[in-house]
């Protein structure tokens, strides 16, 4: 069930304005032609709100919930019932500390919580618990580099603070309903300094941040679901900054920044004043939401119900020593000896930790591991229209298949047949059993085998006169067509090189 916003003693009325198709077209064309004016300097900082992957909420024992029916995962504290008190979730604190260390921040030995006062339907307490005065971590940085497709650039961070999320409002024609399942979900807010000099850097930073929190299993990293929400503060020529709230996708971030830069440049060119304010993105432009508040407006006060967080002086070192290998380090390692992967392949592995573990498990156990993994195994899954799963073809099975090919027990075609069979049938049979079942073992050398190979090749030549003619005209690659038919006829039992030798012998007679 939803809680009607009237429960919170105020009523919203929403007016929806429809945008004509011609207006949308003009907007798209304007953004497509976007360019920076050298006389107007772009400056931007970000505030990134990140939902932490915890079992319970930040200050209560309610489970974190994103897809449950409205208002079904709540505690008395989540709905602001008088007399209830917060209790800090240590799992959320640990994830926030891991993120802070990964962002090269200085963990503070003492941090505390404050109340940020404002009244809105999705905030039943009448305030948000955050860390305004003494945040968890300060003075971090993120290094943008070649792995981010932008020139090297250091983005400095002011702080990382732990805070609670709000509920969610759901709009109807004549009312706003409130779902408090999300209320009190643990967040970290990462605040950068205004170091971004162009939108490419902003895009690269957000991508890198998403990858980092996913890789460390701190957050799902999804913008579209609200797991990460971005506020951008943009100014031109050091004029008052404008905040754009709740940008929910990479496309929105880019389009909103382009639009707002153009808007501010136009104001300055017309000798108009830029007002410090908060604006929202409506899909085609930014619109004013409210005059920009400052700390006085929010009446920050320390939260007397939560104790100060005191951390051991060695906590930073301990976390650094136990933190998983960070994405840049993984990419650097995979693109160098002995792996020598292309950056695109390395990125794909990094996005899928289980697949990366599989790849590293077989590397060193298989000659030409890159060829077998990317061009044979993954190709077999793709051709079977099955998503790669590490438990379908075990690492040991792949090693055994490659070994059988190298020992001439089966051909490469036979290996492909086995892989396809395992993937499509989810077979867990042993390799010897599969070779026997599929009848793809290499036949013993004999005069009878030579005669059979000769007969197969001659028959294929006789029925493919057009291909033979192409070969005669110098199209050597056409020979692969004949070899392919021969391999198919023998179910891959005979190696392709034997058919190649026989075809060349017969065609040169």
Swiss-Prot record:
Keywords: ATP-binding, Ligase, Mitochondrion, Nucleotide-binding, Protein biosynthesis. Its EC number is 6.3.5.-. It catalyses: L-glutamyl-tRNA(Gln) + L-glutamine + ATP + H2O = L-glutaminyl-tRNA(Gln) + L-glutamate + ADP + phosphate + H(+). Gene3D superfamilies: 1.10.10.410. One of its GO terms (molecular function) is glutaminyl-tRNA synthase (glutamine-hydrolyzing) activity. It comes from the Eukaryota. It is an enzyme of class 6 (ligase). GO terms for biological process: glutaminyl-tRNAGln biosynthesis via transamidation; mitochondrial translation. Transmembrane segments: none annotated. Pfam families: GatB_N (PF02934), GatB_Yqey (PF02637). GO terms for cellular component: glutamyl-tRNA(Gln) amidotransferase complex; mitochondrion. Its main location: mitochondrion. This protein may be expected to contain an N-terminal transit peptide but none has been predicted. Allows the formation of correctly charged Gln-tRNA(Gln) through the transamidation of misacylated Glu-tRNA(Gln) in the mitochondria. The reaction takes place in the presence of glutamine and ATP through an activated gamma-phospho-Glu-tRNA(Gln). Subunit of the heterotrimeric GatFAB amidotransferase (AdT) complex, composed of A, B and F subunits. NCBIfam families: gatB (TIGR00133), PRK05477.1-2 (NF004012). Belongs to the GatB/GatE family. GatB subfamily. This is Glutamyl-tRNA(Gln) amidotransferase subunit B, mitochondrial. It comes from Candida dubliniensis (strain CD36 / ATCC MYA-646 / CBS 7987 / NCPF 3949 / NRRL Y-17841).
């Amino acid at each position: 069930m939803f809680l009607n916003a009237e429960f919170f003693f105020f009523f919203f009325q929403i007016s929806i304005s429809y945008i004509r198709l011609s207006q949308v077209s003009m907007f798209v064309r304007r953004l497509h032609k976007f360019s920076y004016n050298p006389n107007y300097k772009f400056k931007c900082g970000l505030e990134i709100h990140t939902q932490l992957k915890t079992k319970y909420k930040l200050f209560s024992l309610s489970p974190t919930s994103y897809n449950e029916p409205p208002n079904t995962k709540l505690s008395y504290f989540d709905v602001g019932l008088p007399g209830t008190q917060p209790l800090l979730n240590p799992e959320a604190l640990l994830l926030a500390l891991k993120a802070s260390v990964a962002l090269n921040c200085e963990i503070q030995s003492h941090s505390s919580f404050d109340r940020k006062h404002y009244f809105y339907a999705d905030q039943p307490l009448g305030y948000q618990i955050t860390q305004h005065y003494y945040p968890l971590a300060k003075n971090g940085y993120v290094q943008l580099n070649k792995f981010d497709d932008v020139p090297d650039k250091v983005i400095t961070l002011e702080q990382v603070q732990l805070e609670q999320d709000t509920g969610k409002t759901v709009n109807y024609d004549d009312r706003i309903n409130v779902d408090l399942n999300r209320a009190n979900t643990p967040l970290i807010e990462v605040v950068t300094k205004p170091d971004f000099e162009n939108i490419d850097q902003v895009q690269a930073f957000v991508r890198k941040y998403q990858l980092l929190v996913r890789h460390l299993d701190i957050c799902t990293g999804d913008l579209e679901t609200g797991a990460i929400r971005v506020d951008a503060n943009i100014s031109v020529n050091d004029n008052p900054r404008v905040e754009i709230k709740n940008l929910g996708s990479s496309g929105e971030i880019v389009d909103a920044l382009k639009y707002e830069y153009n808007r501010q440049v136009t104001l300055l060119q017309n000798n108009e004043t830029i007002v410090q304010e908060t604006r929202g993105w409506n899909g085609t432009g930014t619109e004013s939401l409210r005059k920009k508040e400052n700390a006085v407006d929010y009446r920050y006060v320390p939260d007397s119900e939560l104790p100060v967080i005191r951390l051991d002086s060695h906590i930073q070192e301990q976390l650094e020593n136990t933190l998983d290998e960070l994405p840049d380090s993984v990419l650097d390692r995979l693109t160098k000896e002995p792996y020598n992967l292309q950056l695109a392949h390395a990125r794909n592995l990094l996005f899928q930790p289980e697949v990366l573990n599989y790849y590293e498990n077989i590397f060193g156990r298989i000659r030409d591991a890159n060829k077998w993994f990317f061009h044979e195994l993954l190709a077999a899954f793709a051709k079977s229209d099955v998503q790669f799963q590490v438990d379908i073809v075990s690492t040991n099975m792949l090693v055994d298949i490659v070994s059988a090919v190298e020992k001439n027990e089966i051909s490469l075609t036979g290996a492909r047949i086995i892989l396809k069979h395992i993937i499509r049938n989810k077979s867990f049979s042993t390799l010897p059993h599969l070779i026997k079942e599929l009848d793809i073992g290499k036949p013993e050398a004999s005069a009878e085998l030579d005669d059979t190979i000769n007969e197969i090749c001659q028959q294929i030549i006789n029925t493919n006169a057009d291909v033979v003619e192409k070969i005669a005209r110098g199209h050597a690659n056409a020979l692969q067509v004949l070899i392919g038919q021969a391999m198919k006829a023998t179910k891959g039992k005979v190696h392709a090189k034997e058919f190649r030798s026989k075809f060349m012998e017969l065609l040169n007679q």
